[in-house]
Structure formats: structure tokens, C-alpha cells
Amino acid sequence: MATVIPGDLSEVRDTQKAPSGKRKRGESKPRKNFPCQLCDKAFNSVEKLKVHSFSHTGERPYKCTHQDCTKAFVSKYKLQRHMATHSPEKTHKCNYCEKMFHRKDHLKNHLHTHDPNKETFKCEECGKSYNTKLGFKRHLALHAATSGDLTCKVCLQTFESTGVLLEHLKSHAGKSSGGVKEKKHQCEHCERRFYTRKDVRRHMVVHTGRKDFLCQYCAQRFGRKDHLTRHMKKSHNQELLKVKTEPVDFLDPFTCNMSVPIKDELLPVMSLPSSELLSKPFTNTLQLNLYNTPFQSMQSSGSTHQMITTLPLGMTCPIDMDTVHPSHHLAFKCPFSSTSYAISIPEKEQPLKGEIESYLMELQGGAPSSSQDSQASSSKLGLEPQSGSPDDGAGDLSLSKSSISISDPLNTPALDFSQLFNFIPLNGPPYNPLSVGSLGMSYSQDEAHSSVSQLPTQTQDLQDPANTVGLGSLHSLSAAFTSSLSSSTTLPRFHQAFQ
């Protein structure tokens, strides 16, 4: 049997070309058409056959160029891997003990020490430990070769040199002896065997072709997560360094540390129908009437106009004020230029106040004016806590009228109380649809006079005064106001009442 020499390999290279490039999906493994003439091994490329031939001849053409290093290797890849050990920088780090390594395979071998299921092999002669059976047997072969024994400890076969013995030990890598783990799990599609079922499932992507791991930098897909990690470290190392060195952006103050307890209280209530909300008592709640649009459904003649609790979006819902701030009393102010209440809350509740005020300004600006030649004076109504007897309830609020000075005689055509009657519950006549655009309602003199006289008795608290904060009774209006009403004109705007 002839020995393979470099000259023979050049002839083989010319006659048969090895397949180049990566294997496409669905293609079978390339056939090993290059057998070794000294052993029964075969290879799929001339380069691999050449590297293997060095194990028979003992030649190591790739020598280390570092000073005071005499090591040589059979392939250029192994030389490059060895050169990393001379570099002062260790790029491979253990995530468990922070230990650094020059080579990735050294780190991989070190990780076995952190695996409780892995068994270590300790040499009895020198005390050195190994994590793999192959490494341990190679170490024993070195001790045996030093003493002159070149016998394999597995099959008891004798070899002529230490290098040949070490090459032979690779054939025993999958065999078990003395409690060493065995590859019991075989792939259903090929002959490969694995230690665990997890390794088999990870290997199955080779046959299924699934690539579920996407690179976020180049959109390349991989079948295994470790392959994606290896690709990102190799091809996108600069991008990863930028991500690690970039400072953490400070979040917007409006999105940081913002707790919204009202939202949690409203979620179970918003899912209820409006009829259930009106009939269901809620403890420790505040009833407000915030109108968002003039096109609200009105009841038929003879029915009572109820004051319902609405939000700016038209949803009927009680607001739990204890959740917002339980230790402060609220003061309500209602300017005549608006149809809704604005909430005056302490500093911690300013965001809620700003939202309601901005909504009211939009509503006021969008409403058309019925009389443009008249002017409105600034008058305010306040909701202040009553200081009466304890029977009235500690949390009740009453609607008190501030001091009003009437400088001019009241002119009936210039008066408009439609805004007032839009948010005060009255037992009045049916709603006039022709006055929807101007937010107004028409009443005769008798009806308006009787309605105004009934104001202190019609307004009632919607909830239990012991647990809720309701709207108090209205003070009686001025006699000059009630005596000047006319039956032939539509009631003017409310904010123009007191000129």
C-alpha cells in the first residue's frame, strides 16, 4: 500500500474538483470521494485529505511565528486558533464566573464545570481534571507514551508513535466506559446521535429547513439561536458595541412614574350600561354634570329632566375622589360663560383640571351665539362646603350664589337663560328641537316663572349624602329677574342676564 505524497495530491486535485460553496436546502451531504490510501477513512475534499495525510507522515507545515514558541500544526485554521493564545486580550468570557479565555473551545470546555450533570475525569497521576472523555484519554495516552507504553486504553491496540495513538483515540469518542454519558438519542432522519432530546430537536432544523431566528441588522435568518449569536458577533460586532456604549435615554416625565388610580376605578364601571349606572349607588363618589355636546337625547313631555353624571366623552360614570386625593376638600366654580363645571383642585390634581378646562374652552368656542350685540358681565357661582348642622353630611356641597350687583334695569329681550336651563333639572315643557343649534330652550312667562320658583326644591342629591358629594339647593333668584319675564320672546342667554 503506497503512501500519499504531496505530488500525488496535486494530481488528484487536477482530476477531481471538490464541490465548492454552501449546500442548498434539500440537498444531501456531499459524497466522500477522496479516500485515504493508508486507512479506511474518506473525505469530501482534497484539503481535508491533505490535512489527514499529515497524521500519517507526521508533517506539520504550519509553524507558529511567535518568539519562544516551537509549536506547529497540520492546518492553517489550527495555527490561527493557536495564535489567539499569544494575544493579551481574552475575548471569550464565562457568564457564570467571569473567567476569560482566548479561544471559544476553551470556554466551551470550561462551561462543563458549571453543569451539575457533567462528570469530570481526574488523572490519578498528576491530579489534572478533564470534562470530556476524549481529553482525558488523550492525557492518559501522553502519560503512557512518556513511559513507553503506546497502547490504547480502550481497545488495547498498540501504535508506533504518540501522534498515531492520539489520532486513534478520536475513534473512541462516542463509546462509553465507566459511567460516561452515552449518546442514546438518535435522529429519525439521519444516523446522528445526541446526548439529550433537546439536542435532537435543535438538530431537526437541518432537515425541516425552518429558520425562526432573524438578524435585526441584515434580515438574515437562522435555524438555531446560537448560530444567530455567532453571526451577530462575527458580522455585526460594531453595531453591538454601539448598543452597549450608548447611554440609557431618560424617559419623558409625562410617561415616567405616572400612576393613574382613576383608570383602575373606571374600568369596571365603564362596562356597565347607563341605566345601571344611574340606579346603582356608588360610595364616596362625586356627581358632576359635564356636557360634551348640545345633541343630547331629551325625554318626552311630562317626564323629569334628570341630571346625570357624564364625562367629557359622553360616558356616564362616577369619579372616585378618594382615589385622587382623599385629604383635600374640593371647591367648584361655575362661570356663566360655560355650560359645565370646572374643578378647582390642589396642585397634585392640576393635570385633571387642565384637561377639563381645555375641554370647556373648546366647547364654548364651538357654540354659536344667539345675540351678538349684547355684552356679558363676569359673574360666578361657587360650590362651597356648608357649615350648617351635622345632619346635612360632612361631604355635601351646596351651590351658593355670589354677590350680584345689578346696575341697569333688566331688559327682557336682552335676557337669555337657556344656558342655565340646560344644566338645571326642571319639570318643564318638551324640548324644542329648533333651538338645538343655539343651546337654548323656549318657555312661556308662566312656565318660566313657576320653574324658577321651584328651583330650590327640584335640585336633589343623586347619591347618599353620607357617602357622596352632591349638588346643594340653589338660592332663590332676584325678584327683579322673575318679574321682568315676557311671554312673547325666547329666553336669552344665561351669561347675559346680569348686565
UniProtKB/Swiss-Prot annotation:
- Which segments carry the region annotation Repression domain? 243-383
Pfam families attached here?
zf-C2H2, zf-C2H2_4, zf-met
State the InterPro entries in the record: Zinc_finger (IPR050331), Znf_C2H2_sf (IPR036236), Znf_C2H2_type (IPR013087)
Q: Zinc fingers (C2H2-type): which spans?
A: 34-56, 62-86, 92-114, 121-143, 150-172, 185-207, 213-236
The main location class comes to nucleus
Binding partners and assembly: Interacts with KPNA2, which escorts protein to the nucleus via interaction with nuclear localization signal. Interacts with E3 SUMO-protein ligase PIAS1, PIAS2 and PIAS4.
List the protein's name.
Zinc finger protein PLAG1
What organism is this sequence from? Rattus norvegicus
What gene makes this protein? Plag1
